[in-house]
Amino acid sequence: MIEDTMTLLSLLGRIMRYFLLRPETLFLLCISLALWSYFFHTDEVKTIVKSSRDAVKMVKGKVAEIMQNDRLGGLDVLEAEFSKTWEFKSHNVAVYSIQGRRDHMEDRFEVLMDLANKTHPSIFGIFDGHGGETAAEYVKSRLPEALKQHLQDYEKDKENSVLSYQTILEQQILSIDREMLEKLTVSYDEAGTTCLIALLSDKDLTVANVGDSRGVLCDKDGNAIPLSHDHKPYQLKERKRIKRAGGFISFNGSWRVQGILAMSRSLGDYPLKNLNVVIPDPDILTFDLDKLQPEFMILASDGLWDAFSNEEAVRFIKDRLDEPHFGAKSIVLQSFYRGCPDNITVMVVKFRNSSKTEEQ
């Protein structure tokens, strides 16, 4: 009886080894477990994936910091590696911009302030060009000045005006786009640009966005508050609009309108504008400064956001507000060493209620 039992167990063991330990069986088992985890434990899987990504970002960031500190003595001697750099510094605003690994510099920025007389709210702009620098340069050189003039007129008779910061922003952005399209169409220049504009007054912050440059604010509690939302072709609202216009989106490294443009709204881009698949309409948001009591805001081209999340960027800058560029230079270099291939432009604006900021 015992011998029969042992023989049976031995036979079962051989059968299990033959079937269960075969490579094909193990492969199918792994696939089944993966599918089961995906469909029945989606949240847990997402958490694990997100944690893994954050860990990789953290390691890459630490390596980047070591590289920054070891290369030729630190930050102040790295400019030669970036081909070209640009910077701006005021008492509460700092900008740092690099050409990076690109052959051409297509980013532009502008700062217009009148803190003494306050004839208009402060104007901050980021313009990330594509298909050449023509569009970004055109918008940078004309839109802020046009806004300044209209805002000065508005401030003189604000109480009786039917306008607002939002309507002025929308009117001037659309006007500049129409004006630029006429000129670029004649010269067959297909360049385009993003447009991120922030108007800062005593009580309000108004932000207009076209494209995928982005603004983020750090509130009194250290939270990252989005000031804008990227216009991307894969978003449901944008995808439906593009389809209604007779267009399509396809994946070529990223989702693109007509297989060409990686954003669904822009200024310029006359061939896609003629098809009505890309539009210049800005999204405009207004924020109550008394309620948020912000410490600083970040306005940046997508070169930064390809390397940093909103929350990570806020934490990074918050720890470096005492630096000469309020952390703008450090985060640009960090993005570069994380492998960003694009032009990178970062503007940091400190608010007057920040304990580290002078009277605005």
Curated annotation (Swiss-Prot):
Protein residues bound to Mn(2+) 2: 128, 302, 342
GO (cellular component) term, any one: membrane
Domain (PPM-type phosphatase): residue spans on this chain: 92-351
Keyword entries, A-Z: Hydrolase, Magnesium, Manganese, Membrane, Metal-binding, Protein phosphatase, Transmembrane, Transmembrane helix
Cofactors: Mg(2+); Mn(2+)
Localization (cell): Membrane
Role according to the record: Acts as a suppressor of the SAPK signaling pathways by associating with and dephosphorylating MAP3K7/TAK1 and MAP3K5, and by attenuating the association between MAP3K7/TAK1 and MAP2K4 or MAP2K6.
Similarity comment: family membership: Belongs to the PP2C family.
Protein name: Protein phosphatase 1L
Organism: Bos taurus
